Amino acid sequence: KKEKEQGCYEDFIECLKLYDKEENGTMLLAELQHALLALGENLDDEQVETLFADCMDPEDDEGFIPYSQFVQRLMSDPVVFD
């Protein structure tokens, strides 16, 4: 099970690195929101906002977030939608 979880984490990180233009472990919050709405699971805006509130620190002054921290929190404590 541990290998499967680690593989999923690494897969998520590799996908999000595509948005990491500065190659510093951050991406624009707006790009993460777009990726979540456009790819994978069918999430609506409200679900994405819930996900961000539960799994992420606020964005910095330029709109960037550290995506590895987001993925770690999401995988350690999945968000359940009502």
From Swiss-Prot:
Keyword Chaperone attributed: no
InterPro entries, alphabetized: CALM/Myosin/TropC-like, EF-hand-dom_pair, EF_hand_dom
Top-level division of the source organism's lineage: Eukaryota
Keyword Phosphoprotein: no
Residues spanning the signal sequence: none
Pfam families: EF-hand_7
Cellular component terms per the entry's GO annotation: muscle myosin complex
Record key words, sorted: Motor protein, Muscle protein, Myosin, Repeat
Gene3D superfamilies noted in UniProt: EF-hand (1.10.238.10)
UniProt domain EF-hand: residue ranges: 7-42
GO BP annotations, alphabetical order: mesoderm development
PROSITE patterns, sorted: EF_HAND_2
GO molecular function: calcium ion binding
Subunit architecture: Myosin is a hexamer of 2 heavy chains and 4 light chains.
Protein name, entry field: Myosin light chain alkali
Organism: Drosophila yakuba
